[in-house]
Amino acid sequence: MAGARPLEGTLRGDGRRFGLVASRFNGTLVDQLLGGAVDCLSRHGASPEAIEVVRVPGAWEIPVALEWLAGSGRFDALLALGVVLRGETPHFEFICGECSRGAARVADRHGVPVAFGVLTCDTPEQAAARAGGKAGNKGWEAALAALEMADLRARLTHPD
């Protein structure tokens, strides 16, 4: 890439609006993801008024709430937050697949970044490690992606 300078987003939250959709199922773990995401956005300049949190029953309902938020035109980026744990039936695969596909469809349809912070884990211990434990907080990481993509979107669609 000699001579080429890639265009990347920055981690600026000031002046941007973020919509977070968080499931209530596995609520203790999701609350940790949500706390990490809100903390990250705030530390990077997003005001409390610019962060809107919508709670839905479970991961299955996340995509439709993302669709509603994206369709409102009020947000620079969206975040999906949830925890799905593998059980004894194929239900896990159905829920995880449709949640991720639905989030991607919303981003494609509306051109609004959707950061995916839905944990799909085999055990509660794996989820706890990723929701603020030894593997970090994936809610915080999703918020970083949302910040960067919101800025990149603005730079690409409204160049100064």
Regions found by a protein language model. Give the residues of each.
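Glycine-rich phosphate/diphosphate-binding loop of Rossmann-like nucleotide-binding domains
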Residues: E8-P57
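Electropositive phosphate-/nucleotide-binding environments in soluble metabolic enzymes
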Residues: G15, G27, D31, G35, ...
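Short, ordered loop/turn segments at secondary-structure junctions
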Residues: R24-F25, V83-V84, L119-T123
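Generic secondary-structure signature for well-ordered alpha-helical cores
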Residues: G27, S42-S47, E67-R74, A104-R109, ...
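Short beta-strand segments at enzyme active-site cores
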Residues: V53, D76-L81, P113-L119
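Glycine-rich oxoanion-binding loops at beta->alpha junctions
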Residues: V54-S72, V118-L119, T123-P124
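Glycine-rich phosphate-binding loop
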Residues: E61, A65-G102
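C-terminal binding/interaction regions
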Residues: F92, C96-D160
